[in-house]
Amino acid sequence: MVTVRLFGLLRLDTGIKELTADAGSVRDLYPLLIQEAKKRDPGSKVKKSDIDGCIVMVNGTQGKKSTKLKDGDTVILMSPVSGG
């Protein structure tokens, strides 16, 4: 199992602060996050592209969507910040 923590708009849009999941890569988490968001809010409009634009950290270092995961890893997905 890996621990997934969400920050920024992604946390607000999904209603998910943290969850645990089985996944082979960061990208494998996408459908799980979308499914969990819809379970918490059936009207959720979160989609793959919302997650795809996130900053990825795995165990405190920058990761990629293709980063392989192993049991005990911690993944952080954070929406990029913008504004002026």
Residue ranges: model-predicted function:
Residues M1-G83:
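Ubiquitin-like/PB1-type beta-grasp interaction modules and other compact soluble beta-rich domains
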